[in-house]
Design a protein with these regions (language model features):
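Short, basic, alpha-helical segments at the C-terminal edge of helix-turn-helix-like DNA-binding modules
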Residues: 67-73
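Helix-turn-helix
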Residues: 15-18, 22-60, 64
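Hydrophobic alpha-helical connector segments
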Residues: 64, 78-108, 161-165, 189, ...
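Hydrophobic/aromatic-rich alpha-helical bundle segments in the mid-to-C-terminal region
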Residues: 125-130, 134, 148-196, 203-214
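Amphipathic alpha-helical packing segments from all-alpha helical-bundle domains
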Residues: 74-75, 79, 104-112, 123-149, ...
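Helix-loop "lid/cap" segments that line or gate small-molecule binding pockets
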Residues: 80-81, 96-102, 110-120, 195-199
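N-terminal intrinsically disordered/low-complexity leader segments
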Residues: 1-14, 204-214
């Protein structure tokens, strides 16, 4: 599950893309409950029937909106991971992109809704959702392999460690987006930073990091 929503910086020329951008903006500004085909039509100057022509169902609209937003964030993630800085610094950047900004983060709100609807989805839809998850997983695995090969990280099974790390991020991220009392983003970042230090690095950095608040 990815991080906070970011507005696209390029001009949107295709009608389908305009609808997806408008859907994400509606979720960010008004919440998922206010997202309707008729409302989107008014935003982009189309009839609800025209929008149904592109998407068919609201479930499909939500999934395509999620895919579109992940394309935007994926470009940002790849840019962050290609920087010429230590692997640990790039790992922190990936974590920052992954986590929600906080309560009711629109991208995470959309993720949770798509996850919930996937309980009754067909196999093809679930595969499309899995592809979004695996994009993060592959980038995390590649970064771990690089860090181990350069001696920046302890030797770990990159696939297993990436799976466990994403589960940790998903758990903390869910706490943040639902507004679990006593949970804030900086506290979560400290918890995750301690886990990564203890698991991947040795030496004074891990020992010197102040403990996370309970």
């Amino acid at each position: 599950m990815p991080g906070p929503v970011r507005r696209p910086r390029r001009r949107l020329n295709q009608p389908r893309e305009q609808v997806l951008a408008a859907a994400m903006t509606t979720i960010a500004e008004e919440g998922l409950d206010r997202l309707t085909m008729a409302g989107l039509g008014r935003e982009v100057g189309m009839s609800s029937g025209h929008i149904l022509y592109y998407f068919g169902t609201k479930d499909e609209l939500l999934l395509q909106t999620l895919q579109w937003s992940e394309e935007q964030l994926g470009a940002e993630r790849r840019a962050a991971l290609s920087r010429r800085v230590p692997a640990r610094e790039r790992l922190d950047a990936l974590v920052d992109l992954y986590l929600p900004d906080g309560h009711r983060d629109p991208r995470w709100t959309l993720w949770l809704e798509v996850w919930n609807r996937s309980q009754s989805a067909d196999d093809e839809t679930r595969e499309r959702q899995l592809d979004l998850e695996l994009a993060w997983h592959r980038d995390l695995v590649a970064l771990l392999v690089e860090g181990v090969s350069k001696g920046e990280f302890r030797p770990v099974d990159a696939e297993r460690f990436a799976t466990r790390t994403r589960a940790l991020l998903d758990g903390f991220g869910t706490h943040l987006v639902v507004g679990l009392p006593g949970t804030d983003r900086e506290q979560v970042r400290r918890h995750i930073g301690e886990f990564l230090d203890e698991s991947l690095t040795a030496g004074p950095d891990a020992a010197d990091r102040p403990p996370a608040a309970p």
